[in-house]
Amino acid sequence: MGLILAGASEYILRTKIAPQDEFIAHVNLFNSDPVSDAAFGDSHVARGFVPPQGMLNHAYPSESIPRMAWKVDAYFSDHAPDRVIIQADPHMFAPYRLSKTVGDYPAQFENPTHSKFGLYLSIPRYRANLVNYWASFARNGGQLKSEITFTSGGAHLSPGDISKEPPRYRENAALTRARIHDLGPASTQKAYREIYSKMLTDLNRKGANICMVTFPVSPNFRTAIRTINDAERKGIFAFFEQEAQRIEARYVNWEAITDDLSNFRDTDHLNGDAAKHFSPQLVTECFG
């Protein structure tokens, strides 16, 4: 029985998952001909920013500060940066993010489909999501179709409209997410603040025109997170402002840019239509 399940899982990974794997597309774009204008961060940037012609979005969901810093350094190792958007969101310093080191990230960017004995089941990111794949496979009648659109500029655009959900659902979802994003004391953030600062310093020394951006979240999420730990969040926002002043960068706080729930796919991410709508305005706000 175990061998049958393993064989079926390997088949699904090869025929359904790998052909539409966003990470492979993301790595291929990262390793393509480099440009001087780019954006970096996690899913808030990946799903919420559609870059203009000539700029690429190199953000990837759940990316930690050490991995983002490695990526920025690697990308601009052999060419000069120009306009660079760097995510500046408080949740990047939440405890659940403070254990994610660089690890094998560089190796994944060299070969995103590296596997043992040629088995896709041996690829960690696939193995970690295997239960979710099977659940989705069963729920959708044997079909596995990603709803994410990976654009030529690197954005990972998502459908969804949280305004269609009942108010109680939105409030509970926001509170659950806010608890995950709750910040610990500043002392626990020290090492990651230093990594973040060094990333900005290195970019600044290379002549980058840096814009630090706090990305939009829904009004439900803003309310929920303030009730949990407003003081620590204010400390992070002060840190972002101080860093921007230190390197003479632009800091744009767009956390509350919109109260229209139809702009959000879930409680703290813009949907694809909103990303397309707001991105040109953000570029103007950042760089004129």
Where are these regions (language model features)?
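Hydrophobic membrane-insertion alpha-helices, especially the h-region
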Residues: M1-Y11
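Histidine-centered active-site loop/cap adjacent to the catalytic His
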Residues: D266-G288
